[in-house]
Curated annotation (Swiss-Prot):
GO cellular component labels: cytoplasm; ribonucleoprotein complex; ribosome
Protein name according to UniProt: Small ribosomal subunit protein bS6
SUPFAM superfamilies given in the database record: Ribosomal protein S6
Family annotation (CDD domains): bS6
Gene3D superfamilies linked: 3.30.70.60
Function description: Binds together with bS18 to 16S ribosomal RNA.
HAMAP family cross-referenced by the UniProt entry: Ribosomal_bS6
Length: 95
């Protein structure tokens, strides 16, 4: 198993109180495949460096997790299919 860091930018029209429960629903994929979620850090609404889908802001969340590579690929696929997710970036950690 490898360590990964996933950055997720969510639609700013979403209520910030619903971010944690919706992320938890996505992270259930990792838990089902015997992976672990070490940390979920929700940064809140931030200004984007450039517009994405004509939006100037996004809700940032960073997730540190440990899982197999196939699991993180499936998580990225499911996140990209969701309309409330504007952008994702998966980085392999150095743990």
């Amino acid at each position: 198993m490898r360590h990964y860091e996933v950055m997720i930018i969510l639609d700013p029209s979403q209520d910030e109180r619903t971010v944690a429960p919706s992320l938890d629903k996505f992270l259930e994929i990792v838990r089902k495949e015997n992976g672990t979620v070490e940390k979920v850090d929700i940064w809140g609404k931030r200004r984007l460096a450039y517009p994405i889908a004509k939006k100037e802001e996004g809700i940032y969340a960073v997730v540190n997790l440990t899982c197999e590579s196939a699991t993180v690929l499936e998580l990225d696929r499911v996140l990209n299919l969701n309309d409330s997710v504007m952008r994702t970036k998966v980085l392999r950690g150095d743990k």
